[in-house]
UniProtKB/Swiss-Prot annotation:
Protein name as catalogued: Uncharacterized protein PFA0635c
Major place of residence: membrane
Region spans: Disordered: 184-226
Biased composition regions of type Polar residues, renumbered to the chain: 184-194, 204-225
Gene Ontology cellular component terms for the protein in this record: membrane
Compartment list: Membrane
Transcription recorded as keyword: no
Protein source organism: Plasmodium falciparum (isolate 3D7)
Transmembrane segments: 15-35
Coiled-coil annotated spans: 267-319, 436-477
Keyword field: Coiled coil, Membrane, Merozoite, Transmembrane, Transmembrane helix
Amino acid sequence: MKNIKNMKNIKSEGFIFFVLVFFICIIFGCIYESLHEGPYKKTLNSLHESTKYRHFNKIRLLTEYKDTLQIKVEQKSLRDYVNNDRYNNVNTNDYTSYKDKGEQFNDTICVVDKKKENVTINNEEECNKNFYQYLQYLEHNNKQDNKYEETNYFLQGNDKHIDSEHNGINKMYKETIHKTLTSDVSTENSYTHNNSRDDEPQNGKRTYNNQSNNNLPYDNSSYNISPYHGPNNNVPYNKSNNFEQCNTQDNKHCNDLDTYHTCYGPDNYPQKYDNYRQECDNYRQECDNYRQEYDNYPQKYDNYRQECDNYRQEYDNYPHGFDNYPRGFDNYPHGYDNHPHRPHIYPHGFDNHPHRPHMYPHNFPMRNESVGGPYYRPPHIIERSNYYKNPKKAPHNMMLPCDTMKDNKSICDEQNFQRELEKIIKKNNLQNGNIRDNHDTRINDYNKRLTEYNKRLTEYNKRLTEYTKRLNEHYKRNGYNIQNRQNSIERAQSNDVVLYGHNFQNAFRYKQNTRSYYPHVNSNEATHHQKTMYFTQQNNYSREEYPIKSEQHLYHVKSKRLEKKLYDYQNGTNPVTNFLERHF
């Protein structure tokens, strides 16, 4: 008894011991796991800077392009367009600045300031003043059939530099829309006497339509386009009005809409003018400071005014007017034409100098049209990396190229243009009877093939008729007709497959010669009846199973059954035979 009790105690103690060991292992395992995975959790919680940038950049790009695309898709009225901040706001992170598409403002008023608790006034004059600009904006931006999925094109990069490039293009595009929408033709906020190439604010801030430019990514992009024409034409470089506009007090459009720039490389002008640059001549304020009097100076610019102050400060290291230098900068050989500060006295054949004076009339007809109009953007010659290495944001280092393979707007423009062009071509073809639609083309091809088939079938029928006619003539010449020939065929021994009824699936099953096993097939009626009774007796089937069927049908059924047995026996499909072959 004591031994039994001791055994029970040992078992209970052992069980308790193993339970304790089990729980202790679980506890230590949890502690080890927490200690071991601590660094991983820490790494997971504090992502790498590049990973954070990727997530942030995706959200930012989607947000910015959502706003941009929503601008183009929204149906808006003229008054909403002119004075509503939701179309003029550049802050792309403002999620509340855009409302639903279905919400439309009252067309009888213009919203002046959304932040002033919907304070509205009648401003018909301001609305009408921007009418042409509104029409142009709708034409170029409101017909785009963009979808948010297209923004995924900008998220396929694998490094920070690619996203930065896309970011620059996005900012440039947003700024272009903003300046196009908010260009003011009045002179209230003019900064014509801002004598700084860096555009330091003259009166504290530089404004666009009563809005500060502090949230702009950079000043005065050469991508500012305003492709419209009207009484308030803001494009200063067309051949009809550029001289007058750049001579007026309000010439800030020469600065804001600086479409041409020396960084863009040579333009396709005629000989001796091929590298000509616009009046602003690589600087922003030259429309103010060069009074369009370049051609009135002497040849060597001895009486050059003190406008050198309007260049950047590093230009002041030279005495004003360059008069202390020998005429022609003889200190430099004339072959050194690439010196950035030599005066413009080289022969006219030296057209590659970036700062050559404008020695031809301002109404020269081929200045803009030869390169595609005032909105032409030639290829960029400065590397994109200079944009990120330029702390001063100098304008000649900040220009970004318009790469059609990465410019979402250009791609959408081309796609929409091709789509509309295909619609027009299809419509014209349908009107003219030319089938171009895919479905109609398939039908047309089918009709052609059917016509060809019918033609070939007709030829075949003709040949068959001719063959039949010749065969009948042959039979007549040989003294027998078709019936005699058929009877002779039936009397002959046949090795063909026997088909029963209209169901010819047995033709693929019974390959043996059935005539050798059923000699009664072509026998007389008495023998046929005897054979039928024999089959019935051998298979133990009574005629009551077929009370209504004829003897012919009865023979048909029995013969099929017997054929199946014979076929199974010859081909080894009998279950017993198959079993024996498999196991023995």
